[in-house]
């Protein structure tokens, strides 16, 4: 059975997305990836609309079996937390309208699944994602969000594989 899993690293300026393809015998490869870049000059409402429309287009083109996001975490600035939460809501809605199941993992859980430690740096995540999937492009400094999205997708692939085996 093959499966497509989409990881999304949400943001109000940049949202990275990454789709992995899982083949029989648990072979993982990169399917596609990208970043939705939004202008800080646009209103938040306009950015949320663009985020929704762009991700909806990707979901319509690819139709993944699952969408994976980071769990909400609290920033020092409450307004940042609220704005990010709204971006997450837009992304969840885009998947829900297409009946695509949504899963969430804490950032440290995704990092542990890819790097082996939950407090890994962004650069360590990028390095391991590039090695696991053999895509050196994610080592670029402007690809941190994409690497995080890949980490979330890989984390879900590992977790769902163990769940299917009855391991919790």
From Swiss-Prot:
Chief site of localization: cytoplasm
Intrachain S-S bonds: none
Cofactor stoichiometry and binding remark: Binds 2 Mg(2+) ion per subunit.
Enzyme class at the top of the EC tree: hydrolase
Binding site residues for Mg(2+) 2: 70
Biological process, per Gene Ontology: DNA recombination; DNA repair
Keyword Membrane carried by entry: no
Keyword Iron-sulfur on entry: no
Record: residues binding Mg(2+) 1: 9, 145
Subcellular location: Cytoplasm
InterPro entries documented for this protein: RNaseH-like_sf, RNaseH_sf, X-over_junc_endoDNase_Mg_BS, X-over_junc_endoDNase_RuvC
GO cellular component term of the entry, any: Holliday junction resolvase complex
GO MF assignments: crossover junction DNA endonuclease activity; DNA binding; magnesium ion binding
Enzyme Commission no: 3.1.21.10
Active site: 9, 70, 145
Catalytic reaction equation(s): Endonucleolytic cleavage at a junction such as a reciprocal single-stranded crossover between two homologous DNA duplexes (Holliday junction)
HAMAP family in UniProt: RuvC
Family, similarity comment: Belongs to the RuvC family.
PANTHER family hit by this protein: CROSSOVER JUNCTION ENDODEOXYRIBONUCLEASE RUVC
Function statement: The RuvA-RuvB-RuvC complex processes Holliday junction (HJ) DNA during genetic recombination and DNA repair. Endonuclease that resolves HJ intermediates. Cleaves cruciform DNA by making single-stranded nicks across the HJ at symmetrical positions within the homologous arms, yielding a 5'-phosphate and a 3'-hydroxyl group; requires a central core of homology in the junction. The consensus cleavage sequence is 5'-(A/T)TT(C/G)-3'. Cleavage occurs on the 3'-side of the TT dinucleotide at the point of strand exchange.
Protein name stated in the entry: Crossover junction endodeoxyribonuclease RuvC
Gene: ruvC
